Amino acid sequence: YRGGYTGPIPRPPPIGRPPLRLVVCACYRLSVSDARNCCIKFGSCCHLVK
């Protein structure tokens, strides 16, 4: 992972509770293409975005 983490070892988010910025990245005011990019990069998809 790059950026955001200050600890020596970045820990993956718990299942069902990704970090807030990923939720925002995937779900909040994004176009479909941006949401897809977030899905590909972070594995965080917002299925409400069509």
Curated annotation (Swiss-Prot):
BP GO terms, sorted: defense response to bacterium; defense response to fungus; killing of cells of another organism
Cystine pairs: 25-38, 27-45, 39-46
InterPro entries: Penaeidin (IPR009226)
Alphabetically ordered keywords of this record: Antibiotic, Antimicrobial, Chitin-binding, Disulfide bond, Fungicide
Role played: Antibacterial activity against M.luteus and E.coli bacteria. Antifungal activity against N.crassa and F.oxysporum. Presents chitin-binding activity.
Expression (tissue specificity): Higher expression in hemocytes and to a lesser extent in heart, testis, gills, intestine, lymphoid organ and hepatopancreas. Traces in eyes and subcuticular epithelium. Not present in the brain.
Organism: Penaeus vannamei (Whiteleg shrimp)
A molecular function GO annotation: chitin binding
Name the UniProt record assigns to this protein: Penaeidin-1
Any one annotated GO CC term: cytoplasm
